[in-house]
């Protein structure tokens, strides 16, 4: 063994030790934060939405903005700005306060109250299968499970979600396998292992009927590809079960494909193409766009025999999507043959949830992010292979245990100041079964690196996505773009992206939902995500595939109701 090999091994061992110490400190701080003062940052980014100049938008959408009354529950408070293509969602959810006492003198009482409350709720959850739901008495109703006020009388308030009763029929056993849950809905997850052009093996999951009994099952469904965020898998689109976007759109008649980037839960590669350890982790978002996303799109289109698909992505997945659409000439320059204009020619509708195009103020405020930014290029600190590999070792040992999911949640809350206020509490532990995943240190350098010779997301997003330059030179070739921007998301700057579309992309067919009370992850896991995100998506996709004229959508859409199996299940519950 040469000197360089010994040095590299020593460096990797030291980096592992440093990361373990770092994670231990974060865990202690996260637990203290959770039990003493669990916090949710309700601020937005410092960027203001600028829509005052009426002359900036010189054309209207192909699909005029529509009201969502036909699909949404009555309490949604929506403000429509048709000229600028924005729906402002001002809806406020009535939430149960976890502590009724305030002040430092009641600290111990608060801790005891939290402990006792969680113990009682856990006992009630275990008994709920055998106990019926009784109106007029305290019960383990869906309102309690959804972290809302327990109901003593059935009074219609904001938190009365008609789909909440679906939670009562969910299996709360923790199993890190989507098939375990979806088989209970008569859906099978078909799994594909695909090899990218540069030799990495990635996962693609397909929702299909468990039992094919009718001719309608064989009808061609329009394909939807879903792509996950950083350190997640596409299980994040489905972990809500019957209240997930994946399930809802599947039951609404669409062909759902869950795409996963390299390296996932099980890193795998073609050793002939990727022979060395260094090459196995020598990739970042550019390779994920050029190889992973293109392979996922090509595979879905080949298997469904459609020319175009709908891409729905979250967080990092939106970065991949916009990188491909805006910079496709850099990935596949003119003369690239079949790859030329790859993304604009194969994506019909692009739906971005919590779009990560510009960095938010949280990246400059959080101490741990500042530390990572400073040391991310230092191989003695984070190594040069898998980022925080200790997380994956712990996951492989502990996934499926409620303690593991709880720890993941507390760290998540501590680092980003988001919490489960708007989630279905009973499903919280399930969400963390499908994360984290392996990512490379080089990918994290792409996100955070301060190196002036590199273009990173934190310091160079203006170069990748220039604010005042049109991204689509030929708007007729651009897909329909739908943005769901959470106002309480400080990890990214969604308001800056809104300003770009309103003030620069006037010829592109876009539509924006700006949701006051949502944070970065609520766009996937909020208790009312179907009403506020799923049904607007469904409405616009139905409009696209039915090819109805835009004038048909100037009313409140009362004549375009779609009854989905999800709603029928909710009525039975």
From Swiss-Prot:
| Cellular component aspect of the GO annotation | lipid droplet; membrane
* Localization, UniProt: Lipid droplet; Membrane
State the superkingdom.
Answer: Eukaryota
List the InterPro entries hit by this protein, alphabetically.
AB_hydrolase_fold, AB_hydrolase_lipase
Membrane association type:
Peripheral membrane protein
What keywords does the record list, in alphabetical order? Hydrolase, Lipid degradation, Lipid droplet, Lipid metabolism, Membrane
Q: What class of enzyme is it?
A: hydrolase
Kindly give any further remark recorded in the entry.
Present with 7770 molecules/cell in log phase SD medium.
Q: What is this protein called?
A: Sterol esterase 1
